[in-house]
Design a protein with these regions (language model features):
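Short, low-complexity N-terminal intrinsically disordered segments enriched in polar/charged residues
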Residues: 18-68, 73
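Short beta-strand edge/turn micro-motifs at domain boundaries
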Residues: 23, 147-174
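A short gly/proline-enriched turn/hairpin at secondary-structure junctions
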Residues: 41-46, 80-90, 105
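Short, cysteine-centered beta-strand-loop-beta hairpins and adjacent loop/turn segments enriched
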Residues: 88, 138-147
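Positively charged n-region of N-terminal signal peptides that target proteins for export
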Residues: 1-4, 18-19
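Surface-exposed, charged secondary-structure patches
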Residues: 99-142
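Hydrophobic pocket/interface hotspot
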Residues: 59, 70-72, 79, 91, ...
Length: 174
C-alpha cells in the first residue's frame, strides 16, 4: 500500500512539474502590414516599440509648450520634414527656425487622437521604426481659430526623429 501511495504521489508531482505547450508564447511575430519600397518588393511590417510612442508624446507636448530645446534634443541632426504645403524642412536647425517663427506669430496646439508604432528591417538590414499618429491641430489664422486634422508618419532612428511626413485635412462641417 505504501508503494502505491508513493507511486501515485510521484506521478502527481511529475505531472504538475511538466510544462504544457499552452503556456508557450509565440516566438515569431505576426505581420501587421507591408512596406513597399521603390523597387516594389514587399517587406513585412510588425508592431513596433512602444518607446517610440512615448518619445512622440514628449515631442508633441514640447510643441504645445513651445519648448524648442526639447524638440531639438529629439530631432536627428539630419532631420527632414515634409509639411502638407509641399515645402521641405532640411535639418534640425531649419526645423527649429521654422517653429520659432510659427510660435512667435501663433499658438498652435495639437491634440492626439491615435498613435500606431510599427517597424521593419529593410533590405540593407537597417531597422526602421515608425509612428503613425493622428492629431487635431488648432491654430489662429487671420484672427480666427481654425482646426485641421493631421496625420504624421514619423521615422525614428537611434532614438531620434529623422523624418516626418505631415498630411492635412480640413475639419468636416458636421
Amino acid at each position: 500500500m505504501k508503494k502505491i501511495l508513493v507511486v501515485i504521489l510521484m506521478t502527481i508531482v511529475s505531472i504538475s512539474c511538466t510544462n504544457s505547450n499552452e503556456s508557450e508564447t509565440q516566438s515569431t511575430p505576426n505581420p501587421i502590414g507591408v512596406e513597399i519600397p521603390n523597387d516594389s518588393t514587399r517587406i513585412s511590417l510588425y508592431g513596433g516599440d512602444m518607446n517610440t510612442i512615448k518619445l512622440w508624446e514628449t515631442y508633441i507636448k514640447a510643441h504645445n509648450e513651445k519648448d524648442l530645446k526639447t524638440i531639438e534634443s529629439i530631432n536627428d541632426d539630419a532631420f527632414k520634414g515634409y509639411p502638407p504645403n509641399g515645402d521641405v524642412i532640411d535639418g534640425s536647425k531649419a526645423h527649429i527656425g521654422f517653429l520659432e517663427e510659427w510660435f512667435t506669430n501663433s499658438s498652435p496646439m495639437w491634440r492626439t487622437k491615435y498613435m500606431i508604432a510599427n517597424e521593419f528591417t529593410d533590405n540593407k538590414g537597417v531597422l526602421n521604426q515608425w509612428v503613425t499618429s493622428g492629431q487635431d491641430l488648432t491654430d489662429t489664422v487671420d484672427n480666427e481659430e481654425v482646426t485641421v486634422h493631421h496625420v504624421h508618419d514619423v521615422l525614428f532612428v537611434n532614438g531620434k526623429i529623422k523624418m516626418i511626413y505631415v498630411y492635412e485635412r480640413a475639419k468636416a462641417n458636421e
